[in-house]
Amino acid sequence: MLPALKYLGKTVSVTMDRPLGSRHPKYGFVYKANYGFLPGTVSGDGEEIDAYVLNIDRPLQNYTGKCTAVIHRTDDNDDKLIIIPQEDEISDLEIETQTAFQEKWFKHIIIRKIPAIHLICGFIGFGKTTYAKRLEQELPAVRFTHDEIMCARYGRSPEDFPEKYKLIDKEIRRDAAAEISRGHNVILDYGFWSKKKRQAYYRWARQLTPEVCFHVLRCDLNTAKERVLKRNADNLNELFIDENAFNILLQQYEPLSEEENYPAVFISSPPLSD
């Protein structure tokens, strides 16, 4: 996660090295807002985290206020906190307007919330991808579905399945980390059948963001099997799993229980006719 994001919503103290009305030492433009840094912090560029103090119309030396947003420069790995008075609110448009004197030269995005990773958990046929697609629109988020990518790249019944799956998983982890760094929510529609896999993924996800949650799909196994056999015939864009494979894979499935003590929501999958 971007170092600056941990300050979102918190009260911070800023030391101004370029107060309102001062000029940039190299380029000469006038600072139309107070601009400073958080002492003792480290940003993505190795220097102290910078901050704009907005909605204040006088030069400042020091200021304590709330961090309401982060400007993330996508082309130079630099971030700027947006600090305003505790009682104030500010829109993205107002942030853009008040910081344009400097930020107009950089590609950037405004981040308001710490991005989250949502881990979709459940066995084959439990409705994980249907649920993940809905969540993708609601949040919004960037969704990664392992089986979808596998099928598109290698077909419905790929040879050397475990090795290819590991390659896909490595790519997804890389791309998911990049999306989190851009402030985007991420959905991993993977299944997470075993306790060991859940532990490993949870540790990895927590290294990227403190906001990690399992979404646990529950479903009657007969309904799940019926769904899988039906989509084998109806959907050529799904991995092919016959009844024998379903039964064998079921032996590997360890349902997530509340005793595992992960942040989780539990969802009952609707019947097949829904």
Model features per residue range: what roles?
Residues 114-118, 182-184:
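Pre-Walker A (Motif I) flank of P-loop NTPase domains
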Residues 117, 121, 126, 133-134, ...:
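Conserved GTP-binding G-domain of TRAFAC-class P-loop NTPases and closely related GTPase folds
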Residues 1-113:
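Hydrophobic N-terminal alpha-helices or hydrophobic patches in metabolic proteins across all domains
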Residues 166-169, 173, 218, 243-250:
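Amphipathic alpha-helical transducer elements in NTP-driven molecular machines
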Residues 126, 130-184:
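Conserved substrate/cofactor phosphate-moiety recognition/catalytic segment
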Residues 120-126, 134-135, 160, 195-199, ...:
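A structural preference for long, well-packed, hydrophobic secondary-structure segments
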Residues 163-212:
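Glycine-rich phosphate-binding loop used to anchor ATP phosphates in small-molecule kinases
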Residues 208-228:
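Conserved phosphate-donor/acceptor-positioning beta-strand/loop module used by diverse small-molecule
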